[in-house]
Amino acid sequence: MINNIFNKKLLVYNEKDQRWYNKFDRTKPLFSPSRLLSFKNYIFEKIPAKNLEYPIEFGTSLMQIIQYYFENQSKLDVILNSINEEKLKEVFLLFLDYLKTNDYSLIAVELHLFSPKLNHYWHGFADVVVKTKDDKYKVLEIKTHNEIQSVPSWKFQAGVYDYIISQELSNYEPSAILAFSRKQAKLSVYENDSLDLSFINKINELYS
């Protein structure tokens, strides 16, 4: 099991507030669940943002739960009991069901929180690397807003996009796999390549 998948080369750790910061913009922290004492308090910590036009703390909480679950898969009952937002729990259970239905093994999670250069709002996503039953790799990219339109919305939107990773990359570290796949992912998103519409629709139904 690989724990705490963060690209340390791009992050700076601040001892005073015990948080990771983006090396290129130290005003915007990245959070690591493994460094916090209370998971229940942490997942509902709001992230400061200007012109916040949609409930980003909900989407961010989903990412943090997935990260925490990856590091503590034996504590599923504890995690579920810590989530006091029913829709958040429902989406997380959909994610787990998605893994089980497709027979995916969770092997890496990379969490990002950042502010696009031309906008003032935060958005977050988690890249989840899974191994398929035929020993191939996929990246599940979990969206917390409609990236294609890049417009913040009150309606929470989420989707999972599958990206096949070349078997030649199987010997790379998960962080390298993620970096490689993300370069190709943009085109796939705009072309709607390998979009799992059934899973996206299930999630969006919760917010219709």
Swiss-Prot record:
Alphabetized InterPro entries for the sequence: PDDEXK-like_dom_sf
Source organism, top-level taxon: Bacteria
Record-given protein name: Uncharacterized protein UU146
Natural source organism: Ureaplasma parvum serovar 3 (strain ATCC 700970)
